Regions:
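Short glycine-/acidic-enriched loop or helix-start segments at secondary-structure transitions
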Residues: 6-8, 32, 52-54, 87-89, ...
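Conserved beta-strand termini and adjacent loop/short-helix elements that scaffold enzyme active sites
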Residues: 23-25, 97, 131, 147
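Cysteine-nucleophile active-site neighborhood
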Residues: 44-113
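Amide-donor transfer/coupling interface in amidating biosynthetic enzymes
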Residues: 110-232
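Glycine-rich, phosphate-binding/catalytic loops in enzymes
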Residues: 12-15, 57-61, 94-95, 146-147, ...
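A short acidic, often aromatic-flanked loop/helix-cap motif at beta-alpha or helix-coil junctions
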Residues: 27-31, 102, 135-136, 152-153
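N-terminal beta1-alpha1 cap of cysteine-dependent amidohydrolase-like domains
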Residues: 1-72, 193-232
Length: 232
């Protein structure tokens, strides 16, 4: 979607002086992306389902591209829709319309997650913003890193550093406010009355803690990105 914002993740990338190339696949397609030209691949959220190939014909190519990067040992990050596409890429099932979560949600780091660099600095429990109705089964080759009470498969890793995160760790409180205020009809469909009766209280209660956890995850992901030896 055009109003996707990388928030805390963008700040971490900029702090690491990353050179970022943007592709608006939903609007312009993917073109020819050469694996050797990039050190990492990040796929944020969006409105389609991960299997909506008829309306969004770029999705199969995106799934193949994510797997190509992951199989090459490069860092991959799929957020929300991106996580669902990564799960698809590694042979998992996409479960549509059965996993409604919205607003800041408690998450639990699994035993495998506590060993993973993305979650090593976090408390076993943390909060992060959610906005989805779909989920996925876990790829056979994946390690489950985080879960919630309602939706078990919240974060997984395949291989060295191909990560799928259902939750929006990158969305700071300010980003959430921009998203929800500019998509009021969509908010009302998933959480009727939330904007009027609960948004301010949820933000005041959870946003600061979620921002702190999200910033740690963002920095840790950036640290997984490996540059070619001749560029180090």
């Amino acid at each position: 979607m055009d109003d996707t914002q990388l928030g805390l993740l963008l700040s971490a990338l900029q702090s690491a002086h990353a050179e970022i190339t943007w592709f608006r696949a939903h609007r312009d397609g993917l073109g020819d992306i050469c694996l050797d030209d990039f050190d990492a691949l990040i796929v944020p959220g969006g409105w389609p389902s991960a299997r909506d190939d008829e309306l969004h014909p770029y999705l199969p190519k995106l799934a193949a591209l994510m797997r190509e990067f992951g199989d090459a040992g490069k860092s991959v990050l799929g957020i929300c829709l991106g996580a669902q596409v990564l799960a698809r890429a590694y042979g998992a099932d996409n479960l549509l319309g059965v996993a409604r979560e919205f607003s800041w949600t408690p998450l639990t780091v699994t035993e495998d997650g506590r060993k993973d660099p993305l979650f090593a600095e976090l408390q076993p429990g943390f909060v992060s913003f959610q906005w989805h109705v779909d989920t996925y089964t876990l790829p056979d080759s994946a390690a489950l890193l985080a879960e919630s009470r309602l939706v078990k498969n919240q974060c997984f890793r395949v291989g060295r550093a191909a990560y799928g995160m259902q939750f929006h760790f990158e969305a700071s409180g300010d980003v959430v406010q921009r998203w929800t205020s500019s998509n009021k009809e969509r908010v009302d469909r998933i959480a009727p009355g939330w904007l009027e009766s609960q948004a301010d209280a949820d933000r005041a209660l959870h946003a600061d803690d979620a921002d702190a956890a999200g910033a740690r995850i963002a920095r840790a992901f950036v640290q997984t990105i490996q540059r070619p030896d001749n560029l180090r």
